[in-house]
Structure formats: C-alpha cells, structure tokens
Amino acid sequence: MAHKKGASSSSNGRDSEAKRLGVKRFGGQQVSAGEILVRQRGTKFHPGENVGRGGDDTLFALKTGAVQFSTKRNRRLVNIVETEAVDA
C-alpha cells in the first residue's frame, strides 16, 4: 500500500454546479403565458389558479396576468390573476 499519493492527485476539487433555483417572478409582476414563476426541488410552492407544474416541480404561468402568492391550509400557493383586456 502506497504511503504517498501519486503525482497531481487531490482529494478536493469536486463540487456540483449551482442549479439557479428559486422564485423567478415576484408578487404583483405581470407575466405572459408560459413564463417560469418558480424553479424548485419538491413542492415548496404549490400551483394555484392558472399555474401549471412541470416534471421537475417548476411552476409556470398558464395564462397572462399578475403573479399572486397566497397561503391555503399551510401550503404556499402561486396564482395568476388574469388582467382584463383594456380597449385601446
């Protein structure tokens, strides 16, 4: 059994890349359909009105409107409140 490590070996130097998780659109912000609202691992935030959930638990807007965060039965929900179309 060797008592010295071979040349250029190290027990350090391994770390995973940051996954850029978190809330991407905050309460009151206007979003378009399809925009990502929250990137997460597990359901820290649950989908509410007009919000879909992807296979990796990412929450995204199903309709255009304003983001709203709320709590129901100790669950944090993300909703999209549709904004009425303004006649030009």
Swiss-Prot record:
GO terms for biological process: translation. The keyword Protein transport does not apply. Residues 1-26 are annotated as: Disordered. The keyword Lyase does not apply. PANTHER family: LARGE RIBOSOMAL SUBUNIT PROTEIN BL27M, RIBOSOMAL PROTEIN L27. Keywords: Ribonucleoprotein, Ribosomal protein. One of its GO terms (cellular component) is cytosolic large ribosomal subunit. This is Large ribosomal subunit protein bL27. It comes from the Bacteria. GO terms for molecular function: structural constituent of ribosome. Belongs to the bacterial ribosomal protein bL27 family. It comes from Corynebacterium glutamicum (strain ATCC 13032 / DSM 20300 / JCM 1318 / BCRC 11384 / CCUG 27702 / LMG 3730 / NBRC 12168 / NCIMB 10025 / NRRL B-2784 / 534). HAMAP family: Ribosomal_bL27 (MF_00539).
